[in-house]
Each structure stands twice: as structure tokens, then as C-alpha cells.
């Protein structure tokens, strides 16, 4: 549809509160033409994101087998309400007849026996002859790519400067780095993966891994790119240098996401529609499965890679799995679906915490890690999408669907707000690696990327952008560095910023975090 869906899935497209369509309108539609009217409306309002053939672009595929659990009237009502969790707008300007015609069309039969094999992938490779353009990066830890969604561009920033921009159709986010910070890999919803050299400032090969892509990941040695696909349902392994396919692993289910471990040659993934936990050996590409309690839709790995924190799409229970034996060690009921992809982490007063926004709920929740417990529900005045923090700031930074940036004190959870741009929606904060700079997206067609001082909120730079969304700093987007960030606060709070530091009462996580931080000082 006219606004791109972000971090969505096939089933998530239709999971918000519904409003009834009156019975009279429903009966009226029964007597009217179905497919052609629906097709015309679909092409007008939906095909931009879901493709004219309904195979998905930025939005997911809309195929009968993926929508079979929903009847036409339910789908129509869900389209009417929009999906704030994916930034899809409401279509309440359409009348009940039009909404039902769209729903009927996307439920209609289509040739959905799609395939995308090794030869298709090889044939899709695109090479570029971009001019050599060394970016002269001063500090790789400050690198920050930006996704300008409707501009179909990726920016490369360092501190307050834009070093380069390159074009990529249907870019949506989920950028991954090699651990030497020499290359990034950028996926698109319609299945492409673009390699870009941060050393030479050039686009390298681009390849289409599948028709509709969920996410990408890299092996810890940087040699392999893994693309999880919704259409077809498969996992594609690409050579990270040439981008040629190595192998395709068929998946019998709708994959949620795949995340690599930095501590071992393994990646982990779940399915939205099957109670399975998949483990991929990132060297041999063998896959093993463990049966779990229920399907997992959203999840993340804790910063020390000992636990998986996840929830099913119905979103009424948060579950923590111990990855040593794949057993549940903590469960807690919730009132609204958390957006765990958008969780943030910090250390304070002897405890590790994470916070997450909740879909269509005006609050975030705060949770204690390792001594697993629910801590706090914090009202933010609207349903937000992201909450972020960094050791340099005393606040959690959250959006709430308006022009407000909500600042939540990490000590007492008191809130205050600032307005980056009056009347224009703010979304998503990212920080520079050292935390000195905060980058804000003004989520508008005539939007901006604003760079501010993290401590005093002074605006330092602003750049025009067409629907800017995700931003991906090298340090803050790599789980390997999370313990180091915890170590900054541990050094301040428990070592009083002086050495030697008595660590005799530290737990294993505190010791690792402090050691990782002290190593950077050396």
C-alpha cells in the first residue's frame, strides 16, 4: 500500500483491532461484482507495497494460503484500521463496499506455486562500476548508515557528516556489517541483498535471494550471508564477497527471523506458524530443530547469548528460553503485543534491564534480565514503535506516534517530552558509537534526519529526507558490543571510575562487561 510496512510478516499484516462492517453493507456487496472491482482498488492503493501480482515488495505477499485463517469481512475491517505496528496507515476513507472488494480480491485464487532457485539467483546478480570513492572514515565506531525509505536511498554518515549516498529500490532496513566494518549488506523486501564497501565507497554486487525476504544475517567470520525468505519459504546462503549462492535450505514454515551468534558458529531462527526453534551451523549449513511450547513471532537474544526472549503473535505472554537446554525459565502475562525487535538494554544499580514498546498500546514495559522479572509499565502518551538508550544518556528515548520525543529517566522512570519538529512525526533514535550524537528521524515525505547533542539536546545538523526510518551504528547494532556498553555504567557505578576495581562481588555478566570496556581503554 502507499506507505511501506516495516518489520512485518505475512500474518502480522492483519493483526490489529477490528471494527465491524455493518451487515447491510455486507449483504449489498454479495450482489456486486467481486474480483475486477477489488483488483482495481488493490492496484490503486495496495500494489505499491504488495506488488501487482501480490507477491510482496516492502509489504508481505498476499496469497490465499497465507490468509486462509481470515474471512473477507475480518480482512476488510483490518485494512480499514491500518497497522501502526508496521507504519501502515488507516484506509478508513474507503467505504465498506470498497474495503470488502479489496479483501475478496486478496483472498482470490492465484498461481502461488512460486520458486526461486540457484539459477534464478545467479541470473539476478547486478554489478556496478561506481567510481572509487574512499570515504575517509575517521573512526569506524562512529559509522551510521541511514535508510531513506521513500527516497530509495541509503546514506553513510559519520558524526554530523554525510559521507555518501547510494540508490537501492525498496530498501527497508535490517542492515548488517562485517565485523571489520569494511562492508555492509542491505536487504530489500523484494528479495535483493546489496553489498556496499565502506572502504572504497562503492556498490559491489547485488543479488536477488528470493521473491520476498524477511531478514539477513552474517556468519561471525564474515564469509557467508544468510537470507531468510517468506516467498519461497527457504533460507539462502550467499558468498559474502561474490554474492553468488552457495546453497538453498528449504523451510517448511513462515520464518520469523534469523540471528547469528558472535560467540560460536551458529545462528538461530523461529517460525511464526510452527512451534520450532531452528539452529543453523554457519559453517556446514546443517539445520537442527527443537520443539518448543508455541510458535515465536518476535524475539531477540540477550546480550550474552544465553537466553532467547520471545512472544507469540497473540502477544499475551512473554517467554524466556534458556538456550543451554531450550527450556522456558520465565513467563509473564502481558496486556499488549511487545515489539521485541525494538527492545533496548542497559545496566543500573546492579541489574541488567531491557525495555520494549507495545503494539497499539500507549506504554513501554521495563524488565529485569537474568533475575527475570517484570519491573514497570511506563505511560508514554501514545502507541510508539521504538525505545532506545545509550550509557551516555540518563534517559530511555521513545517515540509515541506523534511529534513528541519521550524521555524516560532510567532511575525513577519519570517522563518528560521534547518536540524535535512541531506537527511532524518523530520516530526512532540511534546514537553514535560513543553516544555523543543522537540521530532522529522525522517520519514525513518532507522529513529530516536531525543530529543533536545527546546530553544537552542542542541541534547540530539537519538533512532533508523522504520518509527516513532505520539508522544503524556499527557499535549499537552489533550484539558483540553490548557487554562493552554495559561496562561503561558498571565502571561508573561500581568502580567509581577508578582502577584497580574490586570485582570479587561481581557476577559473571558484570565481569565480562567490565573487561570488555576496559579492553577498549587499552
Can you say where each PLM-predicted feature lies in the sequence?
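A short beta-strand motif characteristic of beta-propeller blades
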Residues: 124, 161-167, 202-207, 244-250, ...
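Short coil/turn segments that connect the beta-strands within blades of beta-propeller domains
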Residues: 141-142, 180-182, 221-223, 263-266, ...
Amino acid at each position: 500500500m502507499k506507505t511501506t510496512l516495516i518489520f512485518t510478516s505475512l500474518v502480522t499484516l492483519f493483526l490489529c483491532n477490528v471494527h465491524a462492517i455493518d451487515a447491510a453493507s455486507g449483504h449489498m456487496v454479495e450482489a456486486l461484482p467481486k474480483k475486477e472491482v477489488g483488483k482495481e482498488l488493490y492496484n490503486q492503493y495496495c500494489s505499491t507495497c504488495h506488488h501487482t501480482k501480490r507477491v510482496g515488495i516492502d509489504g508481505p505477499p498476499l496469497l490465499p494460503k497465507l490468509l486462509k485463517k481470515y474471512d473477507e469481512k475480518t480482512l476488510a475491517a483490518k485494512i480499514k484500521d491500518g497497522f501502526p505496528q508496521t507504519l501502515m496507515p488507516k484506509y478508513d476513507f474507503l467505504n465498506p463496499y470498497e474495503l470488502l472488494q479489496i479483501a475478496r480480491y486478496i483472498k482470490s485464487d492465484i498461481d502461488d506455486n512460486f520458486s526461486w532457485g540457484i539459477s534464478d539467483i545467479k541470473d539476478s546478480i547486478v554489478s556496478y562500476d561506481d567510481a572509487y570513492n574512499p570515504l575517509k572514515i575517521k573512526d569506524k565506531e562512529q559509522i551510521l548508515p541511514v535508510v531513506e525509505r521513500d527516497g530509495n536511498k541509503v546514506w553513510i554518515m559519520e558524526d554530523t557528516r554525510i559521507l555518501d549516498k547510494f540508490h537501492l529500490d525498496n530498501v527497508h532496513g535490517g542492515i548488517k556489517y562485517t565485523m571489520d566494518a569494511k562492508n555492509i549488506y542491505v536487504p530489500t523486501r523484494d528479495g535483493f541483498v546489496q553489498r556496499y564497501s565502506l572502504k572504497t565507497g562503492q556498490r559491489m554486487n547485488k543479488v536477488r535471494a528470493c521473491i520476498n525476504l524477511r531478514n539477513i544475517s552474517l556468519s561471525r567470520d564474515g564469509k557467508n550471508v544468510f537470507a531468510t525468505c517468506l516467498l519461497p519459504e527457504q533460507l539462502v546462503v550467499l558468498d559474502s564477497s561474490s554474492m553468488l549462492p552457495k546453497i538453498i535450505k528449504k523451510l517448511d514454515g513462515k520464518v520469523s527471523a534469523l540471528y547469528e551468534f558472535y560467540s560460536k558458529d551458529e545462528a538461530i531462527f523461529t517460525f511464526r506458524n510452527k512451534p520450532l526453534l531452528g539452529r543453523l551451523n554457519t559453517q556446514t549449513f546443517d539445520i537442527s530443530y527443537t520443539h518448543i511450547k508455541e510458535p515465536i513471532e518476535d524475539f531477540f537474544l540477550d546480550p550474552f547469548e544465553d537466553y532467547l526472549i520471545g512472544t507469540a503473535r497473540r502477544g499475551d505472554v512473554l517467554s524466556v528460553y534458556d538456550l543451554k537446554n531450550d527450556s522456558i525459565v520465565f513467563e509473564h502475562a502481558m496486556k499488549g503485543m511487545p515489539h521485541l525487535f525494538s527492545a533496548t538494554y542497559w545496566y543500573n544499580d546492579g541489574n541488567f534491564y531491557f525495555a520494549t514498546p507495545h503494539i497499539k498500546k500507549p506504554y513501554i514495559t521495563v524488565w529485569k534480565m537474568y533475575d527475570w522479572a517484570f519491573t514497570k509499565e511506563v505511560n508514554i502518551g501514545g502507541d510508539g514503535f521504538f525505545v532506545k538508550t545509550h550509557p551516555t544518556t540518563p534517559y530511555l528515548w521513545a517515540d509515541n506516534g506523534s511529534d513528541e520525543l519521550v524521555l524516560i529517566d532510567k532511575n525513577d522512570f519519570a517522563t518528560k517530552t521534547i518536540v524535535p519538529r512541531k506537527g511532524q512525526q518523530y520516530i526512532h533514535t540511534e546514537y553514535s558509537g560513543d553516544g555523543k550524537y543522537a540521530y532522529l528521524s522525522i517520519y514525513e515525505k518532507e522529513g529530516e534526519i536531525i543530529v543533536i547533542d545527546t546530553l544537552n539536546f542542542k541541534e547540530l545538523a539537519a538533512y532533508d529526507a523522504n520518509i527516513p526510518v532505520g539508522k544503524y551504528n556499527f557499535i549499537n547494532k552489533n550484539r558483540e558490543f553490548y557487554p562493552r556498553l554495559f561496562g561503561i555504567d558498571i565502571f561508573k557505578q561500581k568502580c567509581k571510575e577508578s582502577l584497580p576495581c574490586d570485582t570479587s562481588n561481581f557476577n559473571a555478566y558484570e565481569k565480562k562487561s567490565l573487561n570488555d570496556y576496559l579492553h577498549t581503554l587499552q
